[in-house]
Regions:
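Structured alpha/beta reader/binder surfaces that contact nucleic acids or chromatin modification marks
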Residues: 2-163
Length: 163
């Protein structure tokens, strides 16, 4: 399976999205990762969740474009490190993740991974979730429409594979 065929949609809070796009955050802390993709790079679409700390962008006409609740960009996850219960991550993990050790432990509850962010791209125009499709193993079970893809209407709690 090529990287073009393999992708994950990640829900990320607006404050973390801002740090990623400013280049401050180069490691994304997750509670899990898709085991099917272990050892191979894959694309990650960034869904900026809706929240109080929403990001905005000034448009050429002077209007503000709200970025939360949309897919605002993508990156390639080229490496993953197990960070708990064993720590196989770089020594500067906290700095790369923009989190201290206590925050990481509280979030992962003792089991987690650090995803290395590379090849970051910001979309000029954010995408709605409806632009993405989830490939179904059993269309009747998942879609009930006889097709082989369904629109994503909300991000999954964890990872959501699609393309």
């Amino acid at each position: 399976m090529s990287m073009e065929e393999t992708a994950v949609l990640l829900s990320i809070h607006p404050e973390w999205c801002q740090k990623i796009f400013r280049g401050e955050k180069t490691m994304e802390i997750r509670k899990n990762f898709p085991k099917d993709f272990q050892g191979q790079p894959f694309k990650c679409f960034i869904y900026c969740t809706k929240g109080q700390n929403a990001g905005f962008r000034m448009e050429p006409d002077g209007s503000l474009l709200r970025l939360d609740g949309t897919v605002i960009g993508e990156f390639t996850r080229d490496r993953v490190y197990e960070i708990a219960p064993l720590n196989h991550a770089p020594d500067d993990l906290e700095a790369q993740a923009c989190m201290d050790r206590d925050q990481i432990w509280k979030y992962t509850h003792g089991k987690g991974y650090a995803w290395h962010i590379t090849e970051l791209k910001t979309y000029e125009t954010p995408l709605d979730l409806a632009a993405f499709h989830l490939r179904c193993e059993n269309a009747l079970r998942w879609c009930n429409n006889g097709g082989c893809a369904m629109h994503i209407e909300r991000p999954a709690n964890g990872n959501c594979c699609g393309n």
